[in-house]
């Protein structure tokens, strides 16, 4: 949760850009990379929505309407979700820090603290994993939009893809660092998919970049 000058608490997504950047630059533990990744995905989503609108509202780009509608459907799912993930990521990390501050004098306290730490760190991995999955969902609809969408906005598709790719790979870093401290049999589903998501991200991103360059220089 961010705090404005004067002590007002508010969500990251409700801050001005200047306020959020100031919070991100501070020495406070949150917001951090996971929140920044979710915000980047939100920016990628917004850029994509702009391109879909510019495509759908112009009959000149009728050949791209289907691709635009598909991308728009994905964006409608992501638009509000990315802001939630940005907030949840910070809250999850704050919970991790609180769990480490739990008392550890008695055996019961030690056991409770250990279980709480594991639970909070697993949650701190699950949040950015969702960001990565949603980032791939957006990336997967951008190549067709670059090929068939409004040609005047194809560079914006490229920027959206770069932001989405950064969001995916950045989120995966946060997944890995939180899973690293947990037993190997914890978060198995995430562990088994990290490399595949990262590889798919690179592959799809390159395809989108190629499509953007081809469209610009055709």
Where are the regions that the model predicts?
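Preference for long, well-ordered alpha-helical segments
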Residues: 138-141, 153-212, 218
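Short, Lys/Arg-enriched N-terminal segments with co-localized hydrophobic residues
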Residues: 1-9
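Conserved phosphate/anionic-ligand binding catalytic regions in large, soluble enzymes, centered on
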Residues: 26-49, 152-171
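Polytopic transmembrane helical bundles with strong interfacial aromatic enrichment
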Residues: 12-15, 130, 177-180
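Short, hydrophobic/aliphatic alpha-helical segments
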Residues: 12-30, 151
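Amphipathic alpha-helical interface segments
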Residues: 89, 93-162, 166
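A structural-propensity feature for long, helix-poor, extended segments
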Residues: 59-97
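Amphipathic alpha-helical coiled-coil segments
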Residues: 71, 75-82, 128, 135, ...
């Amino acid at each position: 949760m961010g705090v404005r000058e004067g002590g007002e608490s508010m969500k990251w997504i409700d801050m001005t850009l200047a306020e959020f950047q100031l919070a991100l630059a501070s020495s406070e533990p949150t917001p951090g990379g996971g929140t920044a990744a979710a915000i980047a995905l939100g920016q990628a989503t917004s850029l994509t929505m702009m391109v879909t609108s510019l495509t759908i509202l112009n009959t000149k780009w009728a050949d791209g309407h289907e691709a635009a509608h598909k991308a728009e459907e994905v964006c409608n799912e992501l638009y509000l979700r990315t802001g939630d993930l940005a907030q949840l990521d910070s809250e999850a990390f704050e919970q991790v820090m609180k769990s480490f501050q739990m008392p550890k004098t008695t055996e019961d306290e030690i056991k409770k603290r250990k279980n709480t730490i594991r639970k909070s760190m697993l949650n701190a991995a699950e949040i950015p994993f969702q960001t990565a999955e949603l980032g791939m969902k957006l990336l997967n609809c951008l190549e067709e939009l670059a090929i068939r969408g409004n040609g005047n906005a194809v560079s914006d598709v490229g920027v959206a893809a770069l932001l989405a790719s950064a969001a995916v790979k950045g989120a995966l870093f946060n997944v890995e660092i939180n899973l690293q401290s947990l037993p190997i049999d914890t978060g198995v589903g995430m562990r088994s998919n990290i490399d595949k998501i990262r590889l798919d991200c690179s592959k799809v991103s390159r395809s989108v970049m190629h499509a953007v360059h081809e469209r610009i220089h055709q």
